[in-house]
């Protein structure tokens, strides 16, 4: 195989290689003969279709498939021959002839000696207590609450239906009429000064509040200004929570309505949530330590840019899913994600290097356990497991996640670490 490599940048390489034409022709010929034996074409007996007919009908497709397979195989072989470790996917262009190709790609930087024993990691620990279960049951009751109108003044926990309009200098918002909405006092949904101003209001009562909006406020006409906000309490309602009886318990999938089973199910769910939260904390902690230790290492520019664009796309999609219009996204919007992307790429490449150098292998048992854990959050766990097993893309994503968790654990076990005991609520807080 003819192949040559040249450096076109600190981390960019250009690989020029030639496909072995005789291998391509051999593969194409063999595939066409196989099709001649197995293909049924009207007017010809099975296995007696002339080669010329087979070539006219399938030749172009067979050649394209063979070329694609041989291209991938030849490139991979050249990469192994030159001991290259790619960072991201290559761009492969046609060379001077149909069999010449030029691949441009970035390589993994040299991290030198990766000594994880010098890292200092804080490993958080926590457990689910009866008080956490009680709090979750209270949260479930709040989800099922109903509202009863009251004549007294609004207080914390009440739902206040509102009509509002604002005066910012010479500008009235809205220009005509009022805006309607509602807020539960103490929920923090509304601006703090407005929410505090609603306390004590009775049905039909009006009030004008002087509100100082911060410069970064989401409404440009109000940002950085002292605004007169006129509010009217259309209605004040207090919450009525359901009793924790059999019917309430059954509504959450516990068919027996048994209180102890209900608490056991809640504990299982909270422990699953806690396990994920502690892993995320550990992953973040290890990542921060790796970034601090290897921030001096140059990252592949194109890989970082691609990661930044991916992060931007995820944010735009989140905005769209929330029902908001992301608007026109500037061509250079990804620049705001470049620092975060560089850190993410650094951690990803380092984790891969640690796995490679220490010959860490994916644990199939851990993959199965993680899959069962994911499936247990759905009503039909077995269907979810089957869906993953029949979808290579889903399984690849799961395996990548598990492999990263394995490496993070491996690093944390060998790093200098101290334990930090947290409450359940603190542990799951982002």
From Swiss-Prot:
Q: Which UniProt keywords apply?
A: Cell cycle, Cell division, Chaperone, Cytoplasm, Isomerase, Rotamase
An example molecular function term from Gene Ontology annotations: ribosome binding
The principal location of this protein is: cytoplasm
Catalytic function, reaction form: [protein]-peptidylproline (omega=180) = [protein]-peptidylproline (omega=0)
The top EC class, named as a word, is: isomerase
Enzyme Commission number: 5.2.1.8
**Which interval of the chain is the signal sequence?**
none
Q: Which GO terms describe its biological process?
A: 'de novo' cotranslational protein folding; cell division; chaperone-mediated protein folding; protein transport; protein unfolding
Family, per the entry? Answer: Belongs to the FKBP-type PPIase family. Tig subfamily.
PANTHER family attached to this UniProt entry: TRIGGER FACTOR CHAPERONE AND PEPTIDYL-PROLYL CIS/TRANS ISOMERASE (PTHR30560), TRIGGER FACTOR-LIKE PROTEIN TIG, CHLOROPLASTIC (PTHR30560:SF3)
- NCBIfam families xref list: tig
| Its job | Involved in protein export. Acts as a chaperone by maintaining the newly synthesized protein in an open conformation. Functions as a peptidyl-prolyl cis-trans isomerase.
Instruction: Identify this protein by name.
Output: Trigger factor
This chain's source organism reads Xanthomonas oryzae pv. oryzae (strain MAFF 311018)
């Amino acid at each position: 195989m003819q192949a040559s490599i040249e450096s076109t940048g600190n981390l960019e390489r250009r690989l020029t290689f030639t496909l072995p034409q005789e291998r391509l022709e051999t593969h194409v010929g063999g595939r066409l003969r196989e099709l001649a034996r197995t293909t049924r074409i009207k007017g010809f007996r099975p296995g007696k279709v002339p080669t010329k007919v087979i070539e006219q009908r399938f030749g172009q497709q067979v050649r394209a498939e063979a070329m694609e397979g041989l291209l991938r195989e030849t490139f991979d072989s050249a990469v192994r021959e030159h001991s290259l470790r790619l960072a991201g996917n290559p761009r492969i262009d046609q060379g001077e002839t149909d069999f010449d190709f030029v691949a441009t790609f970035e390589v993994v930087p040299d991290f030198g000696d990766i000594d994880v024993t010098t890292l200092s990691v804080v490993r958080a620990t926590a457990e689910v207590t009866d008080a956490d279960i009680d709090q979750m049951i209270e949260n479930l009751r709040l989800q099922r609450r109903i509202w009863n109108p009251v004549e007294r003044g609004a207080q914390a926990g009440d739902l206040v239906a509102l009509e509002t309009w604002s005066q910012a200098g010479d500008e009235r918002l809205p220009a005509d009429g009022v805006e309607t909405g509602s807020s539960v006092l103490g929920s923090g949904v509304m601006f703090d000064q407005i929410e505090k101003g609603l306390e004590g209001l009775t049905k039909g009562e009006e009030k004008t509040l002087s509100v100082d909006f911060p410069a970064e406020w989401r409404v440009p006409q109000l940002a950085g200004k002292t605004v007169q906000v006129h509010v009217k309490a259309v209605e004040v309602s207090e919450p009525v929570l359901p009793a924790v009886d059999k019917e309430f318990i059954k509504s959450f999938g516990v068919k027996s309505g048994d209180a102890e089973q209900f608490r056991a199910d809640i504990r299982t769910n909270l422990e699953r949530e806690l396990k994920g939260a502690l892993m995320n904390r550990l992953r973040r902690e290890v990542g921060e330590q790796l970034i601090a230790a290897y921030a001096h290492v140059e990252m592949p520019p194109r890989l970082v840019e691609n990661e930044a664009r991916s992060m931007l796309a995820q944010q735009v999609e989140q905005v769209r899913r929330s029902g908001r219009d992301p608007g026109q996204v500037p061509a250079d919007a990804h620049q705001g994600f470049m620092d975060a992307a560089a850190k993410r790429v650094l951690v990803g490449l380092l984790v891969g290097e640690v796995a490679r150098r220490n010959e860490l292998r994916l644990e199939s048992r851990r993959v199965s356990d993680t899959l069962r854990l994911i499936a247990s959050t759905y009503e039909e766990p077995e269907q979810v497991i089957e869906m993953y097993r029949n979808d290579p893309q889903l399984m690849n994503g799961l395996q990548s996640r598990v492999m990263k968790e394995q490496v993070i654990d491996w690093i944390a076990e060998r790093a200098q670490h101290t334990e930090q005991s947290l409450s359940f609520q603190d542990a799951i807080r982002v």
